[in-house]
């Protein structure tokens, strides 16, 4: 138990040691330095996670299709992603002649930068938050909304009909599913009376909110799958219909940033679900808190990959019907039931 406690305290002690290098450990420069170090670590985690998740998803796709998947490069094919990345870096970076060059070039940066910002407010473990915001839930939802604009920028600036159609699909889909996703989080906010993600995790010390908010958890998983544009909700890049959607004209490193951004958004969405519904770093003392956090995130990522390779892509009208006529009423019903439960608790037990 002492070893587990030491591992839990390790990030906090390292941060304290770095702050101790400054004359005032809590000065502006110390805060900026710690924030910069945290963001660099998040970028490293995102890149490593994406490299691992890409080959893992190909393995899961093979398992779901009763085939071995990549099995040539490295032990059982686990070096395949490295070879693909090197090949991608060697490709020519082309820009269409009639494209809006500025928007065309900054759209991939937005897609890759958004999950970096969202992960800065996620508590990965005890005292392991880059920026502990009181309005963490608001910040997350506000920043992720920008990805809709980035996809529309990519589609419109390419000056390609297929790209524009994919961008318009992205706007329709992500705005539609963002509303029930927001409402699914309101139940947890009502229970905890806070938007601070660290306080939400601490409120789950006795019982994760998945047991108190099962409807909200299911709604969040479905909407999260749609928000990160993964099957069966990947209509914006339906290759049989519109080639690759807003990514059609992108090549080389810029296309790679979109690819990395997809997996980074997946990690960020699963990290938020773990924080809000699965107790974050809370868990039995056999592992340090940050290990429990990443195990839960890994489980949700596996579920997302399993769904992608199990269910077929749905039609656009079915997509909209599910969001507006099924998930949104369920989310509103969950808010009503949560409010009723809180009232009964305060009236009977709390009073």
UniProtKB/Swiss-Prot annotation:
Its main location: membrane. Keywords: Cell membrane, Membrane, NAD, Quinone, Translocase, Transmembrane, Transmembrane helix, Ubiquinone. It holds the Pfam family NADHdh. It is found in: Cell membrane. Its EC number is 7.1.1.-. The chain crosses the membrane at residues 36-56, 106-126, 135-155, 171-191, 203-223, 257-277, 286-306, 330-350. GO terms for cellular component: plasma membrane. It is a multi-pass membrane protein. InterPro entries: NADH_UbQ_OxRdtase_su1/FPO. GO terms for biological process: aerobic respiration. One of its GO terms (molecular function) is NADH dehydrogenase activity. The keyword Transferase does not apply. It catalyses: a quinone + NADH + 5 H(+)(in) = a quinol + NAD(+) + 4 H(+)(out). NDH-1 shuttles electrons from NADH, via FMN and iron-sulfur (Fe-S) centers, to quinones in the respiratory chain. The immediate electron acceptor for the enzyme in this species is believed to be ubiquinone. Couples the redox reaction to proton translocation (for every two electrons transferred, four hydrogen ions are translocated across the cytoplasmic membrane), and thus conserves the redox energy in a proton gradient. This subunit may bind ubiquinone. Belongs to the complex I subunit 1 family. NDH-1 is composed of 14 different subunits. Subunits NuoA, H, J, K, L, M, N constitute the membrane sector of the complex. HAMAP family: NDH1_NuoH. NCBIfam families: PRK06076.1-2 (NF004741). This is NADH-quinone oxidoreductase subunit H. The gene is nuoH.
């Amino acid at each position: 138990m002492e070893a587990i406690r030491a591992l839990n305290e390790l990030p906090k002690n390292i941060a304290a040691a770095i702050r101790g290098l400054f004359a005032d450990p809590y000065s502006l420069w110390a805060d900026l330095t710690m924030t910069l170090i945290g963001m660099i670590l998040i970028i490293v985690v995102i890149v490593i996670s994406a490299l691992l998740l890409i080959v893992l998803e190909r393995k899961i796709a093979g398992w779901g299709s009763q085939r071995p998947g990549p099995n040539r490069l490295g032990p059982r094919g686990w070096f395949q992603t490295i070879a693909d990345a090197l090949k991608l870096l060697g490709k020519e970076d082309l820009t269409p002649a009639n494209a809006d060059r500025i928007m065309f070039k900054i759209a991939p940066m937005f897609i890759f930068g958004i999950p970096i910002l969202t992960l800065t407010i996620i508590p990965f473990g005890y005292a392991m938050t880059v920026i502990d915001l009181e309005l963490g839930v608001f910040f997350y939802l506000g920043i992720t909304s920008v990805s809709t604009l980035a996809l529309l920028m990519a589609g419109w600036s390419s000056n390609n009909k297929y790209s524009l159609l994919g961008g318009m699909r992205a706007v329709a889909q992500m705005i539609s599913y963002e509303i029930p996703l927001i409402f699914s989080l309101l139940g947890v906010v009502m229970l905890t009376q806070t938007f601070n993600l660290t306080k939400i995790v601490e409120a789950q010390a006795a019982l994760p909110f998945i047991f108190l908010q099962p409807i909200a958890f299911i709604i969040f998983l479905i909407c999260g799958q749609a928000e990160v544009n993964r099957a069966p909700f990947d209509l914006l890049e339906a290759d049989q219909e519109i080639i690759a959607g807003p990514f059609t004209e992108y090549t080389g490193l810029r296309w790679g940033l979109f690819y990395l951004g997809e997996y980074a958004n997946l990690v960020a969405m699963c990290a938020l679900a773990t924080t809000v519904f699965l107790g974050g770093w809370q868990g039995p003392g056999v592992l340090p808190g940050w290990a429990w956090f990443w195990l839960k995130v890994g489980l949700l990522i596996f579920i997302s990959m399993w769904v992608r390779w199990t269910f077929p892509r749905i039609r656009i009208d079915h997509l909209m019907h599910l969001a507006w006529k099924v998930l949104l009423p369920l989310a509103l019903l969950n808010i009503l039931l949560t409010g009723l439960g809180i009232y009964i608790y305060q009236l009977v037990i709390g009073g």
